[in-house]
Every structure is written in structure tokens, then in C-alpha cells.
Amino acid sequence: MDERLVSSEADSHESIIEQSLRPQNLAQYIGQKKVKENLRVFIDAAKMRQETLDHVLLYGPPGLGKTTLASIVANEMGVEMRTTSGPAIERPGDLAAILTALEPGDVLFIDEIHRLNRSIEEVLYPAMEDFCLDIVIGKGPSARSVRLDLPPFTLVGATTRVGLLTAPLRDRFGVLSRLEYYTQEELTDIVSRTADVFEVDIEKAPALEIARRSRGTPRVANRLLRRVRDFAQVLGDSRITEEIAHDALERLQVDALGLDHIDHKLLMGMIEKFSGGPVGLDTISATIGEEPHTIEDVYEPYLLQIGFLQRTPRGRVVTPAVYEHFRLEAPARD
């Protein structure tokens, strides 16, 4: 799969950059108004009662700020955050080591929590409910179970696939918050804030232009800003103007709706070879040279979100909006 400027996933280098941009409290966090308002109440209530915050599940598409919100929860509660991920916890012993190292009140953040296997989930259940850990010592007939007390802690889980969580795990979270895509106004504010952190001068119009092409995702907005900054430094006087931003984004092949060359290839392939569909997923896969699961999990969600694709029982179909976007005449439908 080609690397994409508009991908909502972060690589390891980008994760380091994101840490430097991360707001430290709810007041600094832009967007997700309802989620913030509810978390404010839950955090303040827990602090007033001098209790740990209830376990929190953050879910929604990648790149919307789940990790950032987890760190803010820890900051607002005045505690440390320990970070791990579902794939990194391979054995129950791995989870036991993490849990026994927690201090009272700590936040344990598990990213991609839907990827925990069942045996690890079973260790997690009593830890979440009763703050205890059941450990089996020995093997065979002489094996015995020992219960260890754990300090009270808050588990913050993050997932892009909430439907893959088992019901017993999902039901143990007291706070469930869905993160939504951001508005252009919110993304414009995020671009301006990031530019301030980078000490880059940017006008309102180019900040809006970058926001418009960011697919509703702060991670994409910040990535595009970094690339536009490169063009401003090399081709201009380091100030990001509307002209510089427009020229840079065109060179980067990110169009006015945030579609890149791969989106164009997929959509135009469906139009030119299959008259817009319906087309089966395997056929699209063979046409553009990508795995079916990559198309379904990576490319399709945004196209579905903006109404450019429809899933039907007979296959994928491009909508009239695609023809309008590419300035093509839509074929007559039966």
C-alpha cells in the first residue's frame, strides 16, 4: 500500500511529533464538544468524591484524538498515565506485570483494546471490577489460585472497531464516548494552533484551505500543514499564504475534498471500466492492485462518509456526486 498524506494512521515518527502538539487539558482541546463536556463533569465529580474516575472507552475513526484525550484525563486527575496496546499484551503475565506496577489512581491506557485476546480479557475483568488480580500458582492438581489486591486505577481503552469488543469487556466501562469527525472550523483552529507551536506564520485563508482537505481528521490536518510549511520555506519567505498553500496541496495531489491519487484511481477505475458499478470488492481489488481488506478498511470509509460510494447487495456503486466532482456526465440509470 502506498504511503498516503491523507491516511488517518500515524507512523512511529509522527507519533513523536504528535506528542509535542498535544494539549494538556480539556480547555486547550479543540473539538469534540459533547465528549469534553461530559468528561469535565465525570472528572470533577470523581475529584470531589476523592475517587478514581470510572473506566473510560473512547471509540471512533483513527486520528481524532483518543490518545490525546486519555493523556488529558490523566492530567486533569493529577495522576500518571501508563500506555500500552492490545497487540503488545501477548500473555496474561504481561498484563499482570503492568497492573501490579500501577500507583493508586493511575490511568492505564490500552490502545487498540479490541485486539486483546480472550485469556487476557479474563484477567482484566476482576481488575476492572474489584481492583484485584487472580494468579494461578503451580500446575496440574497442585495448582492454586491466589488473589492479589491492586491499587484503584482508571482504565482508558481506545478502539477504532468498537463492534469487535466482547460484550463482557464493553459492559465494564462506565463511560463510553464516541469521537466524531471534526468540522472545518475546528480543523482551521487546530491548524492555526499547530502553526503557532511550529512558530510558522499562517493566514486564516490557507489554514481553512488545509482544513478543508483534511478529511475531518486533525492528524491529516497537521500532516498537511507540515508539508505545506516545507513549500513555504523553500519557495517563499516561510509565511504560509493562500497561494503557497493552494500550490503545495495541488502538488501533493490532495484535491479540494481531501481525495488523493489513490481515491481518484479507485473511483475513476469504477467509472471507466464498470460504468460506475455495481462492482464486487474482489474485482475492485484486482483492478487497482490492493487487497480487499485494505480497500474496505482504509479507502472506503471516507468515500462512504462523503457520499461518493454506496454499498449494495450487488457491489459498490459510485454516486452522482462523483461524476459532479470529476466534471463528468453521469450515465442514465435504469
From Swiss-Prot:
GO molecular function, one term: ATP binding
Catalytic activity entry: ATP + H2O = ADP + phosphate + H(+)
Annotated stretches, region: Large ATPase domain (RuvB-L): 1-182
CDD domains named among the record's database cross-references: AAA
EC id: 3.6.4.-
Lineage: superkingdom: Bacteria
Residues the entry annotates as binding Mg(2+): T67
Residues involved in ATP binding: L21, R22, G63, K66, T67, T68, E129, D130, F131, R172, Y182, R219
Keyword Transcription: no
Protein's UniProt keywords contain Lipoprotein: no
Family annotation (InterPro entries): AAA+_ATPase, AAA_lid_4, DNA_helicase_Holl-junc_RuvB, P-loop_NTPase, RuvB-like_N, RuvB_C, WH-like_DNA-bd_sf, WH_DNA-bd_sf
Record localization: Cytoplasm
Chief subcellular location: cytoplasm
Key words, A-Z: ATP-binding, Cytoplasm, DNA damage, DNA recombination, DNA repair, DNA-binding, Hydrolase, Nucleotide-binding
Family membership noted in the UniProt record: Belongs to the RuvB family.
Function: The RuvA-RuvB-RuvC complex processes Holliday junction (HJ) DNA during genetic recombination and DNA repair, while the RuvA-RuvB complex plays an important role in the rescue of blocked DNA replication forks via replication fork reversal (RFR). RuvA specifically binds to HJ cruciform DNA, conferring on it an open structure. The RuvB hexamer acts as an ATP-dependent pump, pulling dsDNA into and through the RuvAB complex. RuvB forms 2 homohexamers on either side of HJ DNA bound by 1 or 2 RuvA tetramers; 4 subunits per hexamer contact DNA at a time.
Assembly description: Homohexamer. Forms an RuvA(8)-RuvB(12)-Holliday junction (HJ) complex. HJ DNA is sandwiched between 2 RuvA tetramers; dsDNA enters through RuvA and exits via RuvB. An RuvB hexamer assembles on each DNA strand where it exits the tetramer. Each RuvB hexamer is contacted by two RuvA subunits (via domain III) on 2 adjacent RuvB subunits; this complex drives branch migration. In the full resolvosome a probable DNA-RuvA(4)-RuvB(12)-RuvC(2) complex forms which resolves the HJ.
Free-text note regarding domains: Has 3 domains, the large (RuvB-L) and small ATPase (RuvB-S) domains and the C-terminal head (RuvB-H) domain. The head domain binds DNA, while the ATPase domains jointly bind ATP, ADP or are empty depending on the state of the subunit in the translocation cycle. During a single DNA translocation step the structure of each domain remains the same, but their relative positions change.
Protein name: Holliday junction branch migration complex subunit RuvB
